[in-house]
């Protein structure tokens, strides 16, 4: 049944909407909730009372713009003002003032914060939802032991368990447990109330003897028993108020506060009706949980699946910011209380503004954004990375799991993830399955549940209405999995169809008439990264995972190109990333240049600033290029300027290049890639990178450091690019070792420390010898480029605690070279092994040389056949000048649907271009190509086509490293590890075997002695190199062997070793 007009259509929600909605919820609700919790503060004599009048709090507009905050390394925040009152109880006078509480960082439209000039984002955390969960385990006798676990809002856990004798226990610690009757008795219930509120009183009465009944005879006795077992205290403790407070703080506050989410879950699971505002665990909850536990023992009720999303909750940015705001108010309360007491003691008349300071709130948020694991620096490698980063969900973090303790069951895909968490997109390594990505249509509800949209099918009218369902609700509906099956042409076919569906976490096949809900979009259950992979249904899930991760590592190219074969989400991803400049109003373009666009509309002139060579935190270049001309009319929503990695408002991460899948002289062995020099000289894969170099000027004990261009310690050619202030000039080309900022640090020098020539100059000519030390900012190795920006950040009152900063930004142009990493969109990655002249590359039958050559063995074993479909369809699209947007899972319409789509396009391209080699019926998709060196055809036809290939951030310029000299580890005396420490390359056991296999004894000896941990041989080598002569051969044991001997001695094992002389092979005993 076809629909008229736009009926039944839906739009994809903004990809940054989840973050932005969470922050708005914090501003609208969270601030007010925490402010209402702020108590009234009195002095010790109860003469003065301070309170916040929270009904009319205000958030002021930011004092600086986002760009200025980034430029000046400031925080883009809003000032919070709250009316406060100070009441004098003696005269009943009230002084009211508006006080400044502090600064709250603001979220921008992209869902990010700017803190100290750095873009940061807060990740959503998945936690176990508070409530009660029933499970069973087998004991050592093979008998099921049923357990009810109560999880509090703070993550604390208490367990109720029933043993094989039907005795019920409350476990208060890992080793201690008490009778279930003690817990409600300690909460204030007597035995009669307990027995009246349970369904199985005879089971509870069966358990206690006379001694046990005495323990629950009163509340005091129950508290003493509870405290004795909980704290493992012996003897006979005495009941007191301090004992109750300690128990309240250590147990009840940590494990019995359910929160509003926990109260709702507890009411639903136990079928009770306790009011929502009662968020603490009550005796009624414990007794109802006991009844359900007894029912489980006798086969009534169902166990809970802890990994089901209905038992999880999202801790969003709103919750995290609200928790930090509450923590800041607690600190503010302590400050106000101390200030009031001090003012009264010193007979000082306080005012509300004198009592309140902004330090607690400001420092709390600064530490949160700087130190909290869920607050991360925004990854801005390309536009896709920015929006994907904000949609991540993590099981890690405070109150969550760790990568080393999480089980496989938690990491695994669960049926409840359907339409909520992507089954493909997750991290690789130790955190696999713990860090996921939300599906493109997923939303986060007010109660922390992840909701997914479905079309609800009415029985009467067969009309569809979109609803957002939580995991708890859609469990009992028949949900049709494949959305495309609903596109049947008439009602008769619809009635006869048998469709796949999901019901109660199981996948079944059922008639159409029994369907309650259906999916709204074929890509509904995928994340953004996975939704950008064409023909994803033909790829192995592991390769799709790699692809979704590698697309986030793609470097924006200098000349971007949108893909020939895509999925249709490229425009939405580019739009929501904020990389492109979009017209907010319709109007006429009256001026445009590289810095701004002036738009005239409705009598107003709007200036739209553009990004110019802005550095991302991954050193990639963020730049916007105008796409409209002067005197042109634009509409609202039209693209005014393309950003990095966008073309025409669509995401463009790579280039469409001509590829061939064939071996070539071993240069594409094991995922190596052979490329043509056209990709280098044509700037096909050329990218710009911007590096930041920073230096600070301090005020030392001998005086302030000085920025100058007069550096007597350095040669003149190193200072050639400095201006009169000692800072490198804009537009200068700098090489390794050049001085970017000249700086002298004062220091004291004694007369005896002067060199003889310095003393001579002072005595004869009277010249004052400089006592300053050269501490210039120099360009490190691999940093050559063009200076594009210099920033001198001067703050008021410069001191040793508030130094001035000078930042120099240098742009580098990087062509693709051997060692760079490239990848496709199907997990097909490789390293450039050789760059061939274009005349030596294999060429097609029309003479066109191939751009890249891949190993054909990388396809069948990895099972990512989607790259073959994309390759062939891309060739047809290039010849026909078409772009394709392919919806995944097209096999639901008919078998071999993808193949039936590609082959007709190749056939049409062959006919239109009069090139029969494009589609040859004997081997469709393949073609015979020729060797560029000899002109001879290869033996077998080869798959050729246009693939969309990306250049990744893993570039050889950032990774290549060589060590001539450097530091050694103190214990092993071996070179340090890592490029940043000027470390060496480890020669392990297998590397030694390889060198032994080639018989290179002298090279092996050098690696294991001179270049490693033979201290004496290293010293002799240095002296011999300076003086000249024959390098002596190492004698004695290396330091690592001596270390082994010492460690064995520490275990009371004496190990003696012997050295064999080369001359007579006699054994000489020598001590280590």
UniProtKB/Swiss-Prot annotation:
Its EC number is 2.7.7.6. One of its GO terms (cellular component) is mitochondrion. Keywords: Chloroplast, DNA-directed RNA polymerase, Nucleotidyltransferase, Plastid, Transcription, Transferase. It catalyses: RNA(n) + a ribonucleoside 5'-triphosphate = RNA(n+1) + diphosphate. It is found in: Plastid, Chloroplast. GO terms for biological process: DNA-templated transcription. InterPro entries: DNA-dir_RNA_pol_bsu_ext_1_sf, DNA-dir_RNA_pol_su2, DNA-dir_RNAP_su2_dom, DNA-dir_RNAP_su2_hyb_sf, RNA_pol_bsu_bac, RNA_pol_bsu_CS, RNA_pol_Rpb2_2, RNA_pol_Rpb2_2_sf. The keyword Lipid biosynthesis does not apply. SUPFAM superfamilies: beta and beta-prime subunits of DNA dependent RNA-polymerase (SSF64484). Transmembrane segments: none annotated. Its main location: plastid. DNA-dependent RNA polymerase catalyzes the transcription of DNA into RNA using the four ribonucleoside triphosphates as substrates. In plastids the minimal PEP RNA polymerase catalytic core is composed of four subunits: alpha, beta, beta', and beta''. When a (nuclear-encoded) sigma factor is associated with the core the holoenzyme is formed, which can initiate transcription. NCBIfam families: PRK00405.1. PANTHER family: DNA-DIRECTED RNA POLYMERASE I SUBUNIT 2 (PTHR20856). Belongs to the RNA polymerase beta chain family. This is DNA-directed RNA polymerase subunit beta.
């Amino acid at each position: 049944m076809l629909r008229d007009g736009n009926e039944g259509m839906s739009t994809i929600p903004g990809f940054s909407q989840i973050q932005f909605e969470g922050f708005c919820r914090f501003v609208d609700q969270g601030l007010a909730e925490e402010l209402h919790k702020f108590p009234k503060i009195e002095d010790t004599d109860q003469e003065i009372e301070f309170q916040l009048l929270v009904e009319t709090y205000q958030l002021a507009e930011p004092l600086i713009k986002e760009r200025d905050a980034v430029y000046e390394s400031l925080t883009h925040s809003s000032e919070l003002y709250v009316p406060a009152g100070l009441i004098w109880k003696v005269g009943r006078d009230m002084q009211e003032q508006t006080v400044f509480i502090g600064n709250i960082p603001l979220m921008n439209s992209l869902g990010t914060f700017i803190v100290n000039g750095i873009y940061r984002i807060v990740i959503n955390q998945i936690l176990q939802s508070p409530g009660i969960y029933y499970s069973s385990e087998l004991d050592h006798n093979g008998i099921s032991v049923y357990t009810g676990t109560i999880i509090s809002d703070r993550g604390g856990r208490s367990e109720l368990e029933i043993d094989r004798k039907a005795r019920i226990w409350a476990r208060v610690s890992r080793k201690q447990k008490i009778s279930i009757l003690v817990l409600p008795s300690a909460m204030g219930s007597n035995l009669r109330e307990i027995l009246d509120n349970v369904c199985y009183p005879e089971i509870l009465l069966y358990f206690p003897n006379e001694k046990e009944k005495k323990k629950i005879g009163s509340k005091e006795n129950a508290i003493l028993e509870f405290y004795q077992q909980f704290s493992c205290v012996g003897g006979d403790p005495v009941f007191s108020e301090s004992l109750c407070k300690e128990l309240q703080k250590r147990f009840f506050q940590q494990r019995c506060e359910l929160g509003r989410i926990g109260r709702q879950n507890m009411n639903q699971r136990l079928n009770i009706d306790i009011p929502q505002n009662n968020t603490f665990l009550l005796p009624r909850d414990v007794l109802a949980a006991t009844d359900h536990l007894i029912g489980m023992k006798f086969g009534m009720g169902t166990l809970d699946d802890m990994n089901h999303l209905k038992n999880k909750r999202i801790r969003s940015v709103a919750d995290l910011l609200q928790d930090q705001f509450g923590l800041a108010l607690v600190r503010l309360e302590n400050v106000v209380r101390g200030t009031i007491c001090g003012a009264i003691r010193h007979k000082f008349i306080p005012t509300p503004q004198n009592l309140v300071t902004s330090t607690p709130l400001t420092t709390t948020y600064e530490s949160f954004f700087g130190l909290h694991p869920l607050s991360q620096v925004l990854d801005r490698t390309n536009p896709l990375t920015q929006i994907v980063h904000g949609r991540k969900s993590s099981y890690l973090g405070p109150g969550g799991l760790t990568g080393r303790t999480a089980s496989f069951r938690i990491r695994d895909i669960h049926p409840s993830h359907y339409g909520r968490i992507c089954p493909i997109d997750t991290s690789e390594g130790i955190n696999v399955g713990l860090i996921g990505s939300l599906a493109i249509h997923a939303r986060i509800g007010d109660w922390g549940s992840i909701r997914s949209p479905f079309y609800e099918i009415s029985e009467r009218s067969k009309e569809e209405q979109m609803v957002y369902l939580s995991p708890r609700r859609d469990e009992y509906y028949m949900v049709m999995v494949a959305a495309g099956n609903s596109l049947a042409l008439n009602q008769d076919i619809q009635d006869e169809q048998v469709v796949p569906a999901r019901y109660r976490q199981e996948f079944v096949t059922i008639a159409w008439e029994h369907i309650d809900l259906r999916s709204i979009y074929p890509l509904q259950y995928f994340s953004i990264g996975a939704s950008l992979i064409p023909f994803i249904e033909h790829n192995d899930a592991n390769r799709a995972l790699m692809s979704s991760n590698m697309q986030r590592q793609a470097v924006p190219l200098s000349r971007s190109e949108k893909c020939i074969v895509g999925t249709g989400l490229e425009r939405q991803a580019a739009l929501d990333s904020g990389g492109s400049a979009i017209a907010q109003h319709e109007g006429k373009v009256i001026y445009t240049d590289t810095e701004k666009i002036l738009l005239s509309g409705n009598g107003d002139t709007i200036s739209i600033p553009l990004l110019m060579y802005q550095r991302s935190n991954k050193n990639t270049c963020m730049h916007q290029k105008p796409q409209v001309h002067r005197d042109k009319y634009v509409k609202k929503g039209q693209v005014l300027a393309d950003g990095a990695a966008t073309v025409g408002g669509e995401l463009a991460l790579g280039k469409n290049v001509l590829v061939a899948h064939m071996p070539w002289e071993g240069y594409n062995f094991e995922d190596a890639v052979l490329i043509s020099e056209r990709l280098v000289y044509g700037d096909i894969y050329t990218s710009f990178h911007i590096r930041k170099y920073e230096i600070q000027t301090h005020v030392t004990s001998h005086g302030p450091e000085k920025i100058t261009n007069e550096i007597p310690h350095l040669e003149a050619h190193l200072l050639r690019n400095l201006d009169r202030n000692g800072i490198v000039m804009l537009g200068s080309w700098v090489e390794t070792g050049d001085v970017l900022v000249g700086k002298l640090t004062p220091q004291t020098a004694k007369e005896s420390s002067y060199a003889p020539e310095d003393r001579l100059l002072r005595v004869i000519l009277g010249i004052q010898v400089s006592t300053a030390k050269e501490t210039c900012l120099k360009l490190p190795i691999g940093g050559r480029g063009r200076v594009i920006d210099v920033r001198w950040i001067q703050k008021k009152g410069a001191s040793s605690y508030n130094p001035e900063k000078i930042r120099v930004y240098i742009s580098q142009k990087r062509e693709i070279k051997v060692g760079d990493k490239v990848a496709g969109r199907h997990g097909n990655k490789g390293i450039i092994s050789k760059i061939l002249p274009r005349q030596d590359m294999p060429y097609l039958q029309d003479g066109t040389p191939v751009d890249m050559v891949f190993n054909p063995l990388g396809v069948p074993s990895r099972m990512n056949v989607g790259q073959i479909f994309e390759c062939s369809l891309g060739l047809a699209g290039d010849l026909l000048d078409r772009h394709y947007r392919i919806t995944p899972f097209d096999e639901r319409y008919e078998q071999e649907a993808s193949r039936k789509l590609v082959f007709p396009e190749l056939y049409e391209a062959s006919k239109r271009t009069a090139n029969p080699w494009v589609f040859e019926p004997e081997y469709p998709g393949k073609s015979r190509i020729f060797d560029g060196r000899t002109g001879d055809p290869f033996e077998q036809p080869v798959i050729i086509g246009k693939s969309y290939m990306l250049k990744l951030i893993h570039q050889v310029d950032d990774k290549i490293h060589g060590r001539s000299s450097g530091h050694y580890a103190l214990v092993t005396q071996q070179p340090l590890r890592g490029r940043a420490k000027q470390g060496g390359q480890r020669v392990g056991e297998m590397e030694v075997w390889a060198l032994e296999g080639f018989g290179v004894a002298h090279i092996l000896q050098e690696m294991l002695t001179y270049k490693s941990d033979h201290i004496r041989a290293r010293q002799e080598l240095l002296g011999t190199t300076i003086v000249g002569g024959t390098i002596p051969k190492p004698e004695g044991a290396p330091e690592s062997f001596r270390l082994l001997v010492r460690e064995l001695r520490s275990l009371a094992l004496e190990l003696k070793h012997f050295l064999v002389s080369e001359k007579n092979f006699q054994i000489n005993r020598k001590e280590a």
